[in-house]
């Protein structure tokens, strides 16, 4: 999937997200926010200027969120994003209301909508995690000027082919037909079992 496809999936297939920001004491605060639009490099949402959520966005200019879709754990897809935000103001409100017409029931009059403002997540990174696939499927992406930050584990040239890692990998995602062994990153849970059991320290964090 392309970055735009990930962002569009958040808006069109999930929509409701749980957003985390930080308060004045440095403590996390969460709230439910609908992601209402996306383009090739950003996401858009709105909030009211009177909310404490608005104050936190203005002060920190950063957020993180997770969006989930599925009937239960084993049918779920989760997309997590963290990134920089900026306020765009009122101009995009009519467009977002047309794309999410239920908002007209919450803010029914033009006057009531004057409290609203649009924010853009213009730079960030994200992760796709699909538990409905066997083996699981994961991918990372970045947008704006952000770069992907590799996570998980890799096997170095110190590998001695002892197969200890193969025995403890819950997704059987370690390839053993080459030296050193290789982790299939798109299926890895990042559980760290391979790192823990390797007798020669050949498994390192990326």
Where are the regions that the model predicts?
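Short, structured beta-strand-loop surface elements
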Residues: 55-119, 123-125
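A short, well-structured catalytic beta-strand-centered motif of the EAL phosphodiesterase domain
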Residues: 33-37
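Short, surface-exposed beta-strand-loop junctions and turns on beta-sheet-rich folds
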Residues: 51-53, 72, 135-136
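Iron-sulfur cluster-binding cysteine motifs and their immediate structural context
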Residues: 164-181, 193-206
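Ferredoxin-type iron-sulfur electron-transfer modules and their immediate structural context
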Residues: 116-118, 123, 127-168, 172
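Short active-site oxyanion
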Residues: 40-44
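A short, Trp-centered hydrophobic/proline-enriched beta-strand micro-motif
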Residues: 9-28, 63-67
């Amino acid at each position: 999937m392309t970055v735009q496809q990930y962002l569009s999936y958040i808006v069109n297939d999930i929509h409701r997200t749980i957003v985390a920001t930080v308060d004045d004491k440095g403590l996390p605060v969460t709230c439910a926010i609908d992601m209402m639009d996306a383009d090739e490099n950003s996401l858009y949402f709105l909030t009211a200027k009177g909310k404490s959520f608005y104050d936190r966005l203005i002060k920190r200019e950063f957020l993180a969120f997770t969006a989930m879709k599925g009937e239960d754990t084993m049918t779920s897809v989760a997309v997590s994003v963290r990134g920089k935000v900026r306020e765009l103001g009122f101009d995009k409100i009519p467009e977002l209301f047309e794309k999410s017409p239920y908002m007209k029931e919450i803010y029914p009059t033009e006057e009531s909508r004057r409290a609203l403002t649009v924010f853009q997540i213009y730079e960030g990174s994200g992760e796709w995690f699909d538990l409905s696939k066997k083996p699981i499927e994961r991918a990372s992406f970045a947008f704006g000027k952000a770069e992907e930050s590799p996570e998980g584990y890799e096997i170095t040239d110190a590998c001695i082919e002892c197969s200890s890692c193969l025995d403890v990998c819950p997704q059987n995602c370690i390839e053993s037909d080459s030296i050193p062994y290789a982790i299939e990153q798109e299926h890895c849970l990042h559980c760290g079992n391979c790192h823990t059991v390797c007798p020669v320290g050949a498994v390192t964090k990326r």
